[in-house]
Amino acid sequence: MKVKSESEEGGGLERFGAYCKAVELFDLVVLDLSKHSSDFTLTRLIAQQYASADSIAANIEEGYGRGSRKEYTQFLVIARGSAQETMGRYQRFKHWLPEGIINLRTSLCREIIAILTATIKKLRDLEKAK
């Protein structure tokens, strides 16, 4: 059974708001942190931030590709956790990034989390109604 959810309305995954914002967030993480890549004390934190930001979009993609509503929902839960992780680490980057950047990025993370939360609820409600 192919998953039918808000992510498919009007044309598929690339029109799902959380996915588009997750891809945007990853690009911003790279932009924000690439200038700090020569600071060896930040190597691990930067790698973790790249990984958690990438994981948001990657888990949405994988869940979408699974084709079942139940699995898609589970991968959205994982993506939401990665968004939470990315947001928390941005807050801890306060020692190296300007406050304005941190506020913008954490706001974007909150938007992603809100969309994912609403979608998860909708998919779970549909699953219960079966």
Q: Where does each model-flagged region fall?
A:
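Amphipathic alpha-helical assembly/interaction segments
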Residues: 1-130
